[in-house]
């Protein structure tokens, strides 16, 4: 690749602009907002990893997928810092601290984890569909290989997108008219493949999600109070709770896709507007439409980092995970009294509100589904 110190690179990079002028004020403001979200997303995903790793209320396959996604989201925040800090330094101090090779590696890492986390909804829905349709045996049988298979697919997909881009990038001119970390190292064909593949998987996931919700609702309404299999009861319970965990994620995904589609539409419009014009006029026309710093395209970056907070928002929808979240920060204090008299047998235990704490099998099942009813509301 062309060195950022070569005269050719400097001539095409700076042009009539100084280094700090290459980053517009609009770029700078959006970068600050994005870094703020990254600053929040990174520790929250780390906390979420700790919570999931220490919970026993989720099936191992679901825990594997959620931890994998949180790792990708945390790395995504790091990759954005790697890309944006050199641009902020250029704006504030008129100094270039990066190189083409550094920014190429940073953006390759960024695209890899973005691709991996982009199929999160798909792999989680696939795992939950297996858990729902195989609820009689999913918990009792060793079905753990599906979690590793889906996780492998998740990361392989992201790497596949990067590999396609690098193959398509070979042979293209290595003259860059912008700062190294402002350059988009992705080709149009690679972006097209990623968009189409992501759209197909998301549509499939949404349709499957609707089927899973319908199936679990039917199962809930046709429940039998003579059910005695604890594994079956547990799996039905976890299916209901995990569905509520997915709802915030799909809401954020839909909103993000709307804004992302808007951004892509602007880029398509720019391309259509300049393709019939002389080469020397294309830059001026594109700048007039999307801004000198291409600020409109940064809407996608903001949408991407907001989706990294989706799982953290999802904690609130999952009763057990939210309880652990509160316990981690001291909002829930459990101080059981020890030394209870032996005369208080387990069959007579009552809570402070006077309600029974122990039940027969039928009473336990009724109490269990009463709790589930609160989740469905």
Curated annotation (Swiss-Prot):
Domain of life (superkingdom): Eukaryota
SUPFAM superfamilies linked: Family A G protein-coupled receptor-like
UniProt-listed InterPro entries: 7TM_GPCR_serpentine_rcpt_Srab, GPCR_Rhodpsn_7TM, NRL-GPCR1
Cytoplasmic domain ranges by topology: 53-73, 126-146, 210-245, 316-377
Positions bearing carbohydrate: 16
Subcellular location(s) of the protein: Cell membrane
Topology of this chain in the membrane: Multi-pass membrane protein
GO cellular component, one term: plasma membrane
Extracellular side: 1-31, 95-104, 168-188, 267-298
Residue spans crossing the bilayer: 32-52, 74-94, 105-125, 147-167, 189-209, 246-266, 299-315
Keywords of this entry: Cell membrane, G-protein coupled receptor, Glycoprotein, Membrane, Receptor, Transducer, Transmembrane, Transmembrane helix
One GO molecular-function entry: G protein-coupled receptor activity
Similarity remark: Belongs to the G-protein coupled receptor 1 family.
Protein name as it appears in the record: Probable G-protein coupled receptor F27E5.5
Organism listed in the record: Caenorhabditis elegans
